Structure formats: structure tokens, C-alpha cells
Amino acid sequence: MTDAMPPATPHARPHAINPTGCVLVLVDYQHRLMPAIDRHADVVADALCLADAARVLGLRIIGTEQNPQGLGPNVAELRERCDTTLAKMHFDACADGLLDLLRTPNGTPLPDVVIAGCEAHVCLLQTTLGLLRAGYRTWVVAPACGSRTAANHTLAIDRLRQSGAGIVSLEMVLFEWLQTCRHERFRAVLPLIKARGPGQVAPGA
């Protein structure tokens, strides 16, 4: 990065996700990998919900693929929702050019990253640590992350929390992106919230 950003600090500070300076990063939802992921159907469904909400709200979506020649591309439904997809060999996508993609057209870094992906304890973990080192406020959507075992998922989320990432649910992200039930796109996002929720009435519905 050419523009210095302040070091990331733990998310104990009272920051909400900034919907006007945010990008969604979806890490390595590759079709050859997903069948081995614990809860893989729910993991992919939550990632699709994130991507659909981001598209409705006009947020950029960046996908990554680890060694796509070996593991294949991301699942088609997710790949087609991404504005761009970064092929990489490092487990940390920041080492293969992700930081260059986290900028506005005039080159200004977008300060907030919402991230989810697989595997939680490998590429998702290392990419998030790279973002934190680079100074990005980073939120990890835990239910949309997956590992082959639940234990590795839990350990990854615990470590990321200790490292300064914000750990959030799907609904936390969507409602912080919206901020108010008077948002002009609230009614467009509401069906996505209801589709992934237990059927309760969403705030402001």
C-alpha cells in the first residue's frame, strides 16, 4: 500500500461498520473444497446472502481463489456475484494483491472490510491477519466461514477475536449496512434477512 493507514486496534472501541467505506471479501469458496467443509450448505448460503445484500446496497465484492488450477473456481453462484476474483497462491490474499483491490477509483483505501471464507483456520485467518496488519478495520462473519472441522473453525474465530478482528453475525452486518429502516433499500434487503433467519419479524419490518 502506498497510503499509510493507522494500525488496527481491538474492536472493543464503539465502531459500527461504515456502509459508505466498506468492501466485502469472500475467501476461497471453491467447489472442490466445499463438500469437505463442516456445515458447507449453510456456509455457502450465508455467503450468498452477504453478497446479495452487498449488491443491493452497491458495495464492492471481491472474491479470492486459492490455487484455482488445483482446487477449481469458487462455486458459480458466488463467483458471478463478485466484481472481481483474485487468483492466489499465498494463504494470505494480501500477499498476492488484495490490498491493491481495496481502493476507490481515485486510489483511496476503503477503511472497512467485511470478510468471510474458507478454510477459517487457514486462508480466512491469514488474510484477515494481513488486513489487520495493514490497518483495515476488519469484521469476520463467523457463520459464513467454514473449516473441515468445527474445532478448527472455533479456534480460528477465537484467535481472530484476540487479534483485533470484529466477530459478527450475518444480521449484524446487514443491519449495520442499512443503519435505519428508512434506508431506501431496506425493503430490498429485508427478504434476504428473513430467508436466513428463524422466521421472526425483523426490526423495522
Model-derived regions, located:
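Active-site-proximal loop->helix
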Residues: A76-E77, L98-L102, T149-S163
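A charged, well-structured terminal subsegment
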Residues: G166-G199
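Short acidic, Gly/Ser-rich segments with clustered Asp/Glu that frequently serve as metal-coordination loops
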Residues: H31-A36
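Active-site alpha/beta core segments
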Residues: I37-D38, V44-T127, A195
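A short glycine-rich beta-strand->turn/loop micro-motif centered on a GG-aromatic cluster
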Residues: V114-G117, Y136-A150
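A glycine-rich helix N-cap at a beta->alpha junction
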Residues: T84-A93, R159-E171
